[in-house]
Design a protein with these regions (language model features):
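Dinucleotide-binding Rossmann-like beta1-alpha1 core, especially the glycine-rich loop
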Residues: 48-175, 227, 231
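N-terminal Rossmann-like FAD-binding beta1-loop-alpha1 element of flavoenzymes
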Residues: 3-31
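Conserved Rossmann-like nucleotide-cofactor binding loop
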Residues: 13, 37, 331
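Mid-domain catalytic core of redox enzymes
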Residues: 24, 265, 289-431, 435, ...
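Active-site/ligand-binding neighborhood in enzyme catalytic cores
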Residues: 143-145, 152-155, 159-160, 164-299, ...
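C-terminal lid/capping helical subdomain adjacent to the catalytic/cofactor pocket in oxidative enzymes
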Residues: 450, 460-462, 471-543
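Glycine-rich FAD pyrophosphate-binding loop
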Residues: 22-47
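Conserved mid-domain beta->alpha element of the FAD-binding
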Residues: 179, 322, 326-333, 428-437, ...
């Protein structure tokens, strides 16, 4: 009888696990996805032909295994995209590509099929990965500042010479007398950037993102998001960029926050995961959308089955399984396991916290960026803009045209942006009506001098619960849960929410790949999965 793996969630980790199982084992994957969307937080949401990337997903990794997976699903572009020539993008065009396909379910063998073909033209074909310039800046007091920050002449001029001098002295003081205890995020940032720069740029924004004080957030979040970056390193990389243009070599050595180019699907991250889902289904895997895992049954120390509820009808089915991959929030998983784990595990799980997220999409005739000392600008080239102003609630702005021109239905005549708000379920923004949120977004882009409300042609709202696992609450005792998970040999917690870790999608994929490695090898020790993304060097563990 064929072995079965139930996979909770059709996001990057869940779909990668299903694809790997079909490619390398005789295990039948059954993905249970409560929504109608594919990709989880990496889905692409479509509103009137305009596409939203929820939170922004750059396809960048130092794992060759992950990169090969991506480029075998969506191959590199072989000709310029719609805006490459107009904006002078420096793009490395491919000539020939190799695509990989799972063999159809009816095939006599399950080998991966490879296809060599000319590299696609994004103006003529859809299945293509674009190479895009990375530009993210901080917008503060109607000035743009580089992200990550480095003290350059331009930055010094915009901050003011006195403020720059005080920032420099503060940084030198932090280097000479670093805080010994880096348990929490405030000390982590101060030791790398100095107190004055921390208070100017990091403190308010970070508390806007998480809704709690930096002194209450564990430093692991900072370590994962800035990857060994410091003010000194930012300055060194800025100088080095003037002397080198070798993209491929420099990217491998570079901290995540400093990458200069990245890969991106023509129609956003959801296109990648819809492609993977199509292959999974074609090879015989199941993806049950509109169904939710509501119970996990243990027997003899292993997962024996899961209870699945069909959301439309309420019908509940018990699905027996040999393996269970969970990408659901750990708090939910622990609460539904029968028999229940120890009170210590349940207590830690109940205390885990999450930050929720909503995006307000605005379709504009044009931008109207009021930068000090410049005439109003109708466009800027940023992918993301970090909004530091304390007087508005928006945290970031995405300009979707700059991720891929094809995200905007009419990229030549409109600008499609997303205002990102970090919220909690039940707070005023989360409960606000969509029409009121669109009006708030219109007011705020005008207030910060980024666009005019009169230029807004359309708007929409997209909510994403449990988007970011938080490094406060009971997180300091998370090892209690990890030890419990690893004691169940056929339970694999993978992905961002599955591990309660702020992973990028490549890290989430690696955890799924490594879990399947264990199944192939007959290994029941999954401790290696929990080392992915712990290193200060980005992604080296999976290379």
């Amino acid at each position: 009888m064929k072995r079965v793996a139930v996979i909770a969630g059709a996001g990057p980790a869940g779909l990668t696990a299903a694809w790997e199982l079909l490619a390398r084992t005789d295990v039948h994957p059954v993905i249970i996805e409560p929504t109608a969307a594919i990709g989880g937080i990496a889905q692409t949401y479509v509103h009137n032909g305009n596409r939203i990337d929820i939170g922004g997903h750059r396809f960048f990794t130092k794992s060759e295994r992950v990169m090969n997976f991506w480029l075998s699903m969506l191959p590199r572009q072989g000709a310029p995209a719609a805006d490459d020539v107009a904006f002078g993008h420096d793009v490395e065009l491919a000539t020939e590509v190799v695509l990989r396909h799972l063999a159809p379910e009816a095939a006599a063998d399950r080998r991966i099929r490879e296809e060599r073909r000319p590299a696609p033209d994004p103006e003529r074909e859809d299945r293509v990965m674009l190479q895009r310039p990375r530009l993210s800046r901080i917008y503060f007091s109607r000035h743009f500042f580089p992200y990550p920050l480095g003290i350059t002449l331009m930055v010094a001029w915009r901050l003011g010479l006195l403020n720059t001098a005080l920032i420099t002295l503060s940084y030198l003081w932090a280097k000479a007398f670093p805080r010994r205890d880096e348990t929490f995020l405030d000390a982590f940032f101060i030791n790398r950037f100095g107190r004055r720069l921390y208070e100017t740029f990091f403190h308010g924004y970070t508390e806007k993102v998480w809704g709690v004080k930096c002194s209450e957030i564990r430093a692991e979040w900072g370590a994962q998001r800035v990857k060994g970056l410091s003010l000194k390193r930012a300055v060194i990389h800025a100088i080095h960029d003037l002397l080198s243009s070798d993209f491929s070599k420099e990217q491998h050595r570079r901290e995540t926050s400093l990458i200069t180019r990245f890969w991106y699907p023509k129609y956003g991250p959801g296109q990648m995961w819809e492609t993977v889902a199509e292959q999974v289904r074609g090879a015989g895997g199941e993806i049950r959308q509109g169904s939710r895992v509501v119970g996990v049954r243990l027997a003899n120390g292993r997962v024996a089955g899961v209870r699945v509820r069909e959301e439309a009808t309420g019908r509940v089915e018990d699905v027996a399984c040999d393996y269970f991959f969970s990408t659901m929030p750990v708090r939910e998983l622990v609460a539904m396991v029968e028999p229940a784990p120890s009170s210590a595990v349940r207590e830690v799980a109940a205390g885990l916290r999450y930050r929720d997220f909503l995006t307000v999409g605005l379709l504009l005739n044009r931008l109207h960026v009021l930068e000090k000392g410049r005439l109003p600008r109708a466009s800027v080239r940023d992918n993301w803009i970090y909004v530091q102003d304390a007087g508005v609630r928006v945290g970031r702005i995405q300009i979707f045209n700059n991720w891929s021109p094809y995200l905007a239905a009419d990229h030549e005549n409109t600008v499609w942006i997303g205002l990102e708000y970090f919220v909690g379920q039940g707070d005023d923004l989360w409960r606000m009506a969509d029409a009121d949120l669109v009006q708030l977004a219109k007011r705020e882009v005008e207030q910060i001098g980024f666009a005019r409300g009169a230029d807004v042609r359309d708007g929409c709202v997209l909510r994403m619960p449990n988007a970011y696992p938080a490094y406060f609450g009971s997180y300091e005792n998370f090892d209690e849960i990890r030890r419990w998970v690893t004691s169940i040999p056929n339970l694999f917690c993978v992905g961002r929410n599955g591990m309660h870790r702020y992973n990028n999608q490549d890290h989430s994929m690696l955890t799924a790949m490594m879990a399947v490695d264990n199944i192939v090898a007959g290994c029941e020790d999954d401790s290696a999965l929990w080392t992915v993304n712990l290193e200060m060097v980005y992604g080296e563990s999976g290379s």
